[in-house]
Amino acid sequence: MAAKKLLMLVGDYVEDYEVMVPFQALLTVGYAVDAVCPGKKAGETVKTAVHDFEGDQTYSEKPGHRFTLNATFAGTDPAQYDALVLPGGRAPEYLRLNEDVLRLVRHFAEKNKPIAALCHGVQILTAAGVLEGKSCTAYPAVAPEVKRAGGKWVDMPADQAHMDGKLVTAPAWPAHPRWLQQFLKVMGCKIEC
């Protein structure tokens, strides 16, 4: 059986852990993952930001690594992919304004393909209008957008994840273990030791 192929949408100032960890973990279990960014080509990089929880009123932000894209956004055909991954950080703030991004996201939702969104990545789902009747979580500041988009907000600790059908969401990177476990389950992946 051919490896499942996943599409990861990223942009400058995507959260460092939220792109690096899932990208590497999904490759580790044998999936093909194409990381793309509007306006950039394979081999180019996006800047990442490290968001941390240090006791302030919101997360802190520090420069992260450069993340190298391994595919080109232009001409991306969503029909060639089995699932979609939407990391958080600052990138979703502007990616959600790109109609080509929204078209891709709508394809995954309309075809009932698995979607994993983390933190602010859910902002892209709200802009695409695909949360009507769905329950999800995200970074708490995204809750009003989820509700306005017709979604049911699920409040949970930052290290937990939520699954509604084939939609897997989590508040932030501390949820990686549970978020990835749930996403892999939705993808039909079983890991045995």
Give the ranges of each region predicted by the language model.
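Extended, subdomain-level signal for the structured scaffold at the beginning of enzyme domains
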Residues: 1-111, 123-135, 143-193
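Short, thiol/selenol-centered motifs that function as redox-active sites or metal-ligating centers
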Residues: 118-121
